[in-house]
C-alpha cells in the first residue's frame, strides 16, 4: 500500500469509529461492537503507516516544508534564553564500605576419611 492510500484508510476508519461511537453512547450495542472491531483494524493500519512513513522518510519521498516566518517568530519568543545561574555542587564523598572477609571453608577432615583411602 502506498503512504497516501494508508493515510486515507486511516481517515476512513477514524470517521467510521467516530460515527459508531456516537451511536454506542446512545446505547446501540451493535455500534459498540463495530467500534471495538474497527479500533483493532485501525491499530493494524497505523502500524503499516508507521513502517511506510519511516521508509518514505529515509528514501527521501517525504520532505519537510520550512516553517513560516510567523511560526518561527513565535517559536523564538517562547524560547527566549533565560540566564542560567547554577551553583556548583560540592563533590560528594565516596562512601567507604568495609569488605567482610569470606568465611573460611577449612574444615578439619575426620580421621575416618584418611582411613578409608
Curated annotation (Swiss-Prot):
Keyword Secreted: no
Stored InterPro entries: Hc1
UniProt keyword annotation of Membrane present: no
Residue ranges of the region described as Disordered: 57-117
Pfam families: Hc1
Compositional bias (Low complexity): 82-94
Domain of life: Bacteria
Disulfide pairings: none
Coiled-coil regions, chain positions: none
Biased composition (Basic residues): 66-81, 95-117
Example GO molecular function: structural constituent of chromatin
The entry's keywords: DNA-binding, Repeat
UniProt record similarity statement: Belongs to the histone H1/H5 family. HCT subfamily.
Function: Might have a role analogous to that of eukaryotic histone proteins.
Protein name per the record: Histone H1-like protein HC1
Gene: hctA
